[in-house]
Regions:
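N-terminal accessory/interface modules of nucleic-acid-binding and processing proteins
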Residues: 1-182
Length: 182
């Protein structure tokens, strides 16, 4: 588990992992019973793979947890974004561009944690940093000259249904609905 930020409690990573474990237990229990083994984990045909607003698919544990979250909350569009990404909708590119209504998270909505592991790659002798993508291209012999330090980071995302996108950016919302219509 991650290192606590304070002496009083668990880290953001620990909280996210606890939430994920609780969700798995809850879903497993909901499927138990007389005919539980016949029930699918997810309602068939209702959801596609979760993505961020830019269209990049989530993977691994994040994808599984976001699918469970969508199923539990009844979200029809599995698209997620951080608070900062929502705020980017409110930035205009030009000074004389007309200000559109502000995009925001709906009052009372809560974010959902996703976790991302990033890697810092440092040359053992020169202490020079290189990008993870560049490190992966090195030969095994060249890789031995570097130390790799993983870092687990937690981000908090909102489903697009938790925002006012439908009301203030109807053209964008229509594109999302078309993408996920069945």
């Amino acid at each position: 588990m991650g290192k606590p930020y304070t002496k009083e409690g668990p880290s953001a990573e620990d909280k996210a992992l606890d939430l994920f474990a609780d969700m798995m237990i809850e879903r497993t229990q909901s499927l138990s019973g007389k005919d539980g083994w016949k029930k699918p984990w997810f309602t068939e045909g209702t959801l596609q793979w979760p993505k961020n607003l830019n269209g990049r698919e989530y993977n691994g544990m994040n994808a599984m947890m976001l699918l469970l979250h969508c199923e539990k909350e009844g979200y029809k569009i599995p698209r997620f974004c951080t608070f900062d990404r929502i705020q980017q909708f409110n930035k205009t590119g030009k000074k004389d561009e007309e200000q559109k209504p502000r995009v925001s998270v709906l009052k009372g909505e809560h974010s959902f944690p996703v976790m991302l592991t990033t890697f810092t790659v440092v040359n053992k002798e020169t202490k020079e940093h290189i990008k993870w993508e560049d490190y992966k291209l090195l030969s095994q012999e060249e890789r031995e000259k570097y130390n790799v330090y993983p870092k687990l980071q937690t981000y908090h995302v909102f489903n697009v249904s938790q925002t006012n996108l439908k009301e203030v950016r109807p053209e964008f919302w229509e594109k999302l609905e078309q993408e996920y219509s069945m």
